[in-house]
């Protein structure tokens, strides 16, 4: 069994029992590692060094700043479970993927960087409502994941351009052309 000794001073348990005051007085840093049967058993610490360690622990336990963050920042509300229809069902307007949809999509081999936008979900629901097909909830989520993968990759991963924006002329001259 390997172990790490955290002090250069090592003494056998018999020597410590025989004259503990002298052993601790000679210890560098007020700490000595005590061995029994050629293995570290415990550390012996002087009262002064113990007081230093306790003061250091108390100092580290106090916050380094007087700014306190509100606890509600750390407490995320539990998502209320959504009633998912059992078995196969046709797409309906209020359908939502599970809260851990991005994780599930990754398990299905679809890496999504961002969550589903409301526009993407609305488009998906509208398309499949018109189709009238029935699938299980997990199958709908898989279809949504594939739809997002294809839709987002169609433009090289870039967001779609707004067709209403007016383009601005480029005044740079490409290399190799005279201006």
UniProtKB/Swiss-Prot annotation:
Changing residue 76 to A: In the residue 1-88 fragment, slightly decreased dissociation of PriB-ssDNA. Transmembrane segments: none annotated. One of its GO terms (molecular function) is magnesium ion binding. The N-terminus (NT, residues 1-88) dissociates PriB from ssDNA, but a smaller region (residues 1-69) does not. The NT is also involved in trimerization. The C-terminus (CT, residues 99-154) is involved in ssDNA binding and forms a 3-helix bundle with a long flexible tail (residues 155-179). Both domains are required for cooperative ssDNA-binding. The CT is also involved in trimerization. Changing residue 127 to A: Very low ssDNA binding. It comes from Escherichia coli (strain K12). Keywords: DNA replication, DNA-binding, Primosome. SsDNA binds at residues 124, 127-128, 133, 143, 146. Residues 156-179 are annotated as: Disordered. The lineage of its organism: Bacteria, Pseudomonadati, Pseudomonadota, Gammaproteobacteria, Enterobacterales. There are about 50 molecules per cell. At this concentration it should exist in a 3:1 monomer:trimer state. Changing residue 74 to A: In the residue 1-88 fragment, strongly decreased dissociation of PriB-ssDNA. It comes from the Bacteria. This is Replication restart protein DnaT.
